[in-house]
């Protein structure tokens, strides 16, 4: 552009050699006043004559949109003009059109309903757009209402964006129309759920912002199909601590009788298994119960707690060999008051008891039920006999039988004479 202006200035000044050659300044070249005819000098008019054929004052079309139009500089009749407020120049001075609006027109025929932007300097009248008619709320189901409701926008949206939102809502309504038709066809079929149909009939006349269709669900029993060849496992019933295995016959269903027992079904009582635990026995005293088992001459856990302590004491005193011999040979048993007595002493006591019982047995005298006393018995005068000392506090069973009556005096004299002769 600067080269064209310099050429034009050189051609104008070529006729007069005496005149000075003046080149346009950068501000003159860049300012819009020179293009629109605001300056009156010759250079400005030359620049205007060169640039005006390309950009006219009546309609200036953007070069990028000229390709869409079929080579025509004016827009088609179907497109609406896009008006912009006047722009003030930076150098000082306004456009040649004055306070009128500029005639920049978008040549794109596809954009027909663009929103108009409001200007703070000039009031622009916004033409009311016709809103699409919506079907009545009673004919729509709750599901279609949820689909048809546009996205809620905050109330702080400016007036300039309101036509755009209406346009979007209109497009959204047009796109959702086939979905409404499908849902209305589905509602016409008898397979529709009763809850959705009932809610659609009871809806109020005014549309609600968001309504969701609810459906009630009820628990139903679940049946598992088992293969026909495999019978179900027989149930097991516990009765009085025993496990009862029920044997079912093929082709019959299980029945429940009184107290949970199946009637007329053969069953066998399975008794619990008894585990025989190995019981330890002390090698010295023979007991089976002890707080702790100890090591003995024949290995671990062979002596009870008391016998094990006694064996350990003998090992320290006499050695292992003598301790083992005394522990194994001199066995003990439980005596009186829970005390332990060696087997040798116990056998001696038992033999003495048996001898005393044999010696204490008497023979009847003179046809009376009297007992014959041992030889140590000596009768005294007066007819009362004294008993020999008894061991271990033992007394005869029949004490009254020990009283011997004195024989008649004739028999006493005969016995004394017989003793003197001998």
From Swiss-Prot:
Could you confirm whether the keyword Calcium appears in this record?
A: no
Q: Where are the zinc fingers (GATA-type)?
A: 282-307
Give the induction text.
Answer: Up-regulation during the yeast-to-hypha transition is dependent upon the function of YAK1. HOG1 represses the expression of BRG1 via the transcriptional repressor SKO1. Regulated by TYE7 during late-stage biofilm formation.
Compositionally biased residues, Polar residues: 46-61, 146-159, 195-205
User: Which Pfam families is this protein grouped with?
Assistant: GATA
Cellular localisation: Nucleus
* Coiled-coil blocks: none
| Region feature Disordered, mapped onto this chain | 1-86, 116-207
On the tree of life, the source organism's domain of life is: Eukaryota
Which keywords describe this protein according to UniProt?
Cell adhesion, Metal-binding, Nucleus, Transcription, Transcription regulation, Virulence, Zinc, Zinc-finger
Check the record and name the InterPro entries matching this protein: Znf_GATA, Znf_NHR/GATA
Any idea which GO molecular function terms this record carries? DNA-binding transcription activator activity; sequence-specific DNA binding; transcription cis-regulatory region binding; zinc ion binding
Q: Its GO CC terms?
A: chromatin; nucleus
Stretches of Low complexity bias are at 1-19, 36-45, 69-81, 120-143, 160-194
The knockout outcome noted for this protein's gene is: Attenuates virulence in a mouse model of systemic infection.
A GO BP term here is:
filamentous growth of a population of unicellular organisms in response to starvation
Q: How does it assemble?
A: Interacts with HDA1.
Chain's role: Transcription factor required for hyphal growth, biofilm formation, and virulence. Promotes formation of both conventional and pheromone-stimulated biofilms. Binds and recruits HDA1 to promoters of hypha-specific genes in a rapamycin-dependent manner. Involved in the switch between two heritable states, the white and opaque states. These two cell types differ in many characteristics, including cell structure, mating competence, and virulence. Each state is heritable for many generations, and switching between states occurs stochastically at low frequency.
Q: Per its record, how is this protein called by name?
A: Biofilm regulator 1
């Amino acid at each position: 552009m600067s080269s064209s202006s310099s050429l034009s200035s050189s051609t104008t000044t070529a006729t007069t050699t005496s005149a000075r050659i003046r080149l346009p300044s950068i501000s003159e070249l860049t300012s819009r006043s020179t293009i629109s005819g605001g300056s009156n000098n010759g250079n400005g008019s030359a620049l205007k004559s060169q640039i005006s054929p390309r950009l006219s004052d009546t309609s200036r079309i953007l070069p990028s949109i000229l390709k869409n139009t079929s080579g025509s500089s004016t827009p088609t009749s179907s497109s609406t003009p896009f008006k912009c407020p006047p722009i003030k120049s930076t150098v000082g001075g306004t456009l040649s059109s004055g306070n009128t609006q500029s005639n920049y027109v978008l040549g794109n025929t596809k954009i027909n309903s663009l929103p108009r932007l409001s200007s703070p300097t000039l009031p622009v009248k916004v033409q009311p757009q016709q809103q699409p008619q919506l079907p009545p709320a009673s004919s729509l189901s709750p599901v279609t209402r949820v689909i048809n409701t546009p996205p809620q926008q905050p109330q702080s949206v400016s007036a300039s964006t309101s036509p755009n939102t209406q346009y979007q809502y209109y497009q959204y309504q047009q796109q959702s129309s086939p979905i409404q038709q499908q849902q209305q066809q589905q509602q016409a079929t008898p397979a529709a759920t009763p809850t959705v149909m009932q809610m659609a009939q009871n809806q109020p006349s005014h549309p609600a912002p968001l309504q969701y269709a609810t459906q009630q669900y009820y628990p139903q029993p679940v049946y598992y199909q088992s293969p026909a060849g495999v019978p179900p496992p027989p149930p097991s019933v516990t009765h009085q601590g025993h496990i009862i295995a029920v044997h079912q016959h093929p082709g019959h269903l299980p029945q429940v009788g009184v107290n949970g027992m199946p009637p007329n079904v053969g069953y066998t009582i399975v008794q619990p298994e008894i585990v025989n635990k190995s019981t330890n026995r002390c090698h010295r005293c023979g007991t089976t119960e002890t707080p702790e088992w100890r090591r003995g001459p024949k290995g671990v856990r062979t002596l009870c707690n008391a016998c094990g302590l006694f064996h350990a004491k003998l090992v320290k005193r006499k050695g292992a060999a003598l301790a083992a011999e005394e522990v194994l040979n001199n066995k003990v048993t439980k005596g009186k008051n829970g005390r332990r007595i060696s087997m040798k002493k116990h056998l001696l006591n038992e033999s003495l008891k048996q001898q005393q019982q044999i010696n204490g047995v008497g023979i009847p005298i003179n046809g009376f039920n009297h007992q014959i006393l041992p030889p140590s018995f000596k009768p005294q005068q007066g007819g009362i006999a004294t008993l020999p000392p008894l061991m271990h506090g033992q007394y005869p069973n029949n004490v009254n039988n020990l009283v011997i009556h004195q024989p008649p005096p004739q028999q006493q004299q005969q016995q004394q004479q017989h003793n003197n002769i001998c």
